[in-house]
Amino acid sequence: MERLAIREIIKAVQGELICGSQRGEILGVSIDSRTIKKGEIFFALKGERFDGHDFIQKAIDKGATAAVVSRKKIVATKIAIIKVSHTLTALQELAKFYRQKFNPVVVGVTGSNGKTTTKDMLQALLSSKYTVTATLGNYNNIVGLPLTLFEISPKTEFLILEMGTNHAGEIKRLAEISLPQMGVITNIGATHLQFFRCISNVLSAKMELVQLLPRRGKVALNIDDTHLRSQFKKIKQKIITFGTDPQADVLANNIVISRPGEKERLSFTVCVGRDRKEFDLYCLGRYNIYNALAAISVAKEFGISLSLMADVLGKFKFPKLRMEKLEYGEVTIVNDAYNANPTSVKAVLSEFVSSFPSRRKIVVLGDMLELGRISRKFHQEIGKIVATSPIYSLIAIGEDARFIAQAARNCGMEGDNIFYFKDKKVASRKLKELLKPKDAVLIKGSRKMGLEEIMKYLS
């Protein structure tokens, strides 16, 4: 981060200096007193289970130069204390101010599934030619995205921002802060329905990104997604379509999936106009072709050749917890515990079954969270799929995961092979009892379930 004068910060956040001096400058921004560094400004954010105001003294002790607060009564100190109405809004406004000091090409990436992988692929492609700053991990929300903006430097030519949401208006706010010139929407699925209520509202939330793009902006959209396709005529910006539909601007065909027992590989031809190039992705999950196409759709707009892109993606290392293949003795475990929603679980189950046709298969499935009133229905749908697939055993973990187990039993799966637990440590012991050499195991659940810990319990 480039240095910022405290007087600039006061103006940007429309704050009131209630302690200390407006002279001086800050070297960075922090919201965590545990990791704050000397010279940084501390934003005292409030959450459901914490209040940053309780940690101001700790931040000062670690060398904070200034703090942004929403309380008048603060510990006596010599550092600059800036009072605002809402500290989160102030963080966002400062990020917007800082973003406007630079002129990178900003690309926003959103969608129900595949955001992080698409963002990482695009970062790899653009980094082959440009200096790129991108969202760290999955810092994709109304707190994380502003923190990413502070990573911009004068050398940044491209800024790639993952944009997540579980409420209407959030992506609009993220776009207002970051000012993207190009957008990507990977797909639309049944996510966060506890808040969105229906898929049409999910679509509307994702389309907020397009609405905030400039008239001369560009947007890459999945042509195979019927929800997105319904929006094409409403969009004023240039649309770049990707998918397997022959009408796609960036088309994948000749798709070949490696045979069971071979090294995992997805081979396909990418067609852009008259250009053709063979691509290889070394991973499980056919849906990763769509993630690659989304990234290619953006990179081609900025002069990256298909030949160079094929080379870069052929070396791409996929993020952990996404169809991550692990060996546990003679057992193969596919760890896809990063997150889960009905669309992604159905896709992963299909990939898992087809990838291990001759193996005895066990699936460990956790809750799909934030589905609201129809959560039971969606979990039951997954149970039916498990029961009608060549899966030996099901271990369901959580609260609503019990509906997966119940539906699997009701649809004819052998009851002795169905297990339900609320505790993942207990579930791990049962999994360990079941395992036999050459078994294949799938682990998948929502992020808050933390099912990757099963690997720790197994060992």
Q: What do these predicted ranges mean?
A:
Residues 1-93, 97, 284, 355-356, ...:
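N-terminal leader/targeting and accessory segments in enzymes
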Residues 7-8, 12, 70-77, 184-332, ...:
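Acidic, Mg2+-coordinating active-site environments of NTP-dependent enzymes
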Residues 7-11, 89-223, 227-236, 299, ...:
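Phosphate-binding loop of NTP-binding sites
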Residues 49, 319, 337-413:
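Active-site beta-alpha connecting loops in nucleotide-dependent enzymes
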Residues 82-86, 417-423, 427:
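Short acidic-hydrophobic, aromatic-tinged amphipathic segments that line or gate anion-handling sites
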Residues 104-110, 184-189, 222, 292, ...:
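Short beta-strands and strand-loop turn motifs
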Residues 109, 320-324, 448-454:
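ATP-dependent carboxylate/acyl-activation modules
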Residues 427-434:
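Short amphipathic alpha-helix with an adjacent loop that forms part of the alpha/beta core around
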